[in-house]
Regions:
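Short amphipathic, basic-aromatic surface patches that mediate peripheral association
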Residues: 66-74
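C-terminal motif of bacterial Sec signal peptides marking the signal peptidase cleavage site
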Residues: 22-25
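An anionic, turn-rich surface loop/hairpin at beta-sheet edges
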Residues: 89-120
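Post-signal peptide N-terminal segment of mature Sec-exported envelope proteins
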Residues: 34-54
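Short coil-to-beta strand junction motifs in C2/discoidin
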Residues: 74-82, 141-142
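Exposed low-complexity, polar/acidic, P/S/T/G-rich flexible segments that act as propeptides
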Residues: 85, 134-152
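Bacterial signal peptide processing site
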Residues: 27-29
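Noncatalytic modules at the cell exterior or secretory-pathway interfaces
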Residues: 58-66, 117-135
Length: 152
């Protein structure tokens, strides 16, 4: 009798844990989220990161976020990118040098919503990202990601 009660509690606990994990993994409205690694020796200006979405999305009804994972040793407070034909300027730290975003160890991750002017009327399936910083290779950037979600 005691064993059955113990097994029932364990079964209930496993079910609850599974449900919580499932709920945490569901992000409503997100239909594309991907990070790509940058060459560990540095990001060359001609190294283009290409993101091919599984389905085309219409920019006015979606929100695009760009995410950057970088080392604390990244020597700039900002980064300039070209996304398809738009130039994007992102600040990775505030005016006194405090990194934005969160991190573990010496790696930080920060993301921000962006608006791409060239996409106002188009259906988009592919995004191409490259940096336009003067340093080449650009050191300290580990991953660049995008997240696309429907706006409510």
């Amino acid at each position: 009798m005691q064993q059955k009660k113990h097994n029932s509690i364990i079964g209930w606990g496993i079910s609850l844990l599974t449900m919580l994990i499932f709920m945490a993994s569901c992000h409503e409205g997100i239909f594309y989220h991907s990070y790509q690694p940058v060459n560990p020796t540095g990001w060359e200006q001609n190294d283009t990161l290409v993101y091919i979405c599984p389905q085309a999305w219409y920019a006015p009804s979606c929100q695009l976020e760009i995410g950057i994972r970088h080392k604390d040793s990244y020597k700039y407070r900002d980064i300039w990118l070209i996304i398809n034909t738009d130039t994007v300027h992102l600040y990775l730290s505030d005016s006194i040098g405090n990194w934005k975003g969160n991190g573990i160890g010496d790696t930080r991750q920060w993301s921000a919503p962006i608006h791409l002017n060239s996409f106002d009327q188009d259906s988009i399936k592919e995004l191409r990202i490259m940096h336009i910083m003067q340093d080449t290779p650009l050191k300290g950037i580990e991953h660049v990601g995008i997240r696309i979600k429907e706006t409510p």
